[in-house]
């Protein structure tokens, strides 16, 4: 049976009364966002809107993006990525649990020196997935060219974010490539392994 989203008490600034809000709304007020599921268009739209709002409120304060995601849609993930680069606020990324595929790409896209992971996190990189089903050959060819273009773009971005040579990224992402938090730091996907909030 699903647990549901927990509610917590929250007092609006200037109000003497508390009200109950879902925990994500409460944490959002502290500039803490979560990517805790598959990356979809809906998830991307929500995160993009929240980042734009928080940046417009105060671009001098960082936005904290906690990631525990198996990845998902490349186009939805790139919308989040572009917004992370677009906002003036630093975006601190923190892996809790698993950052795989597009989740790992977004983890690595955080502000330099502010890409973090908890000690028992796992990070997995690989090439973008694409599939076809009963489509015309010309459509399959168009889709294959687009997947290869996206693969090249993601690998080049990953090489830039990690400092690894493009050829190494291309080889490592050819299949699922799992790393521990420490290995991800050595690889350049993150900057620091943390075990306490004060380290973030």
Curated annotation (Swiss-Prot):
Catalytic reaction list: Hydrolysis of proteins to small peptides in the presence of ATP and magnesium. alpha-casein is the usual test substrate. In the absence of ATP, only oligopeptides shorter than five residues are hydrolyzed (such as succinyl-Leu-Tyr-|-NHMec, and Leu-Tyr-Leu-|-Tyr-Trp, in which cleavage of the -Tyr-|-Leu- and -Tyr-|-Trp bonds also occurs)
A single GO BP: protein quality control for misfolded or incompletely synthesized proteins
Record's GO cellular component terms: cytoplasm; endopeptidase Clp complex
Keywords associated with the record: Cytoplasm, Hydrolase, Protease, Serine protease
EC number of this enzyme: 3.4.21.92
Keyword flag Cytoplasm: yes
Subcellular location, record wording: Cytoplasm
Gene3D superfamilies referenced in this protein's UniProt entry, alphabetically: 2-enoyl-CoA Hydratase, Chain A, domain 1 (3.90.226.10)
Active-site residue list: 101, 126
One Pfam match: CLP_protease
Keyword Isomerase tagged: no
Domain of life the protein comes from: Bacteria
Family: Belongs to the peptidase S14 family.
Protein task: Cleaves peptides in various proteins in a process that requires ATP hydrolysis. Has a chymotrypsin-like activity. Plays a major role in the degradation of misfolded proteins.
Self-association state and partner proteins as the record states: Fourteen ClpP subunits assemble into 2 heptameric rings which stack back to back to give a disk-like structure with a central cavity, resembling the structure of eukaryotic proteasomes.
PANTHER family in UniProt: ATP-DEPENDENT CLP PROTEASE PROTEOLYTIC SUBUNIT
Name assigned to this protein: ATP-dependent Clp protease proteolytic subunit 2
Phylogenetic classification of the source organism: Bacteria, Bacillati, Cyanobacteriota, Cyanophyceae, Synechococcales
Gene name as annotated: clpP2
């Amino acid at each position: 049976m699903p647990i549901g989203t927990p509610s917590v008490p929250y007092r609006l600034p200037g109000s003497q009364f508390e009200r109950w809000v879902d925990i994500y709304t409460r944490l959002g007020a502290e500039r803490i966002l979560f990517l805790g599921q598959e990356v979809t268009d809906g998830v991307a739209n929500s995160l993009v809107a929240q980042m734009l709002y928080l940046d417009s409120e105060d671009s001098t304060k960082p936005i904290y993006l906690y990631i525990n995601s198996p990845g998902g849609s490349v186009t939805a993930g790139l919308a989040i990525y572009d917004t992370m680069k677009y906002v003036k606020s630093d975006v601190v990324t923190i892996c809790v649990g698993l950052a795989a595929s597009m989740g790992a790409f977004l983890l690595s896209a955080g502000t330099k020196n502010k890409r973090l992971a908890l000690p028992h996190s796992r990070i997995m990189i690989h090439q973008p997935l694409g599939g076809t089903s009963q489509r015309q050959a010309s459509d399959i060819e168009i889709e294959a060219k687009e997947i290869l273009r996206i693969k090249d773009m993601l690998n080049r971005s990953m090489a830039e974010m990690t400092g690894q040579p493009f050829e190494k990224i291309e080889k490592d992402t050819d299949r699922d490539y799992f790393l521990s938090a420490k290995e991800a730091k050595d690889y350049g996907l993150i900057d620091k392994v943390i075990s306490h909030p004060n380290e973030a």
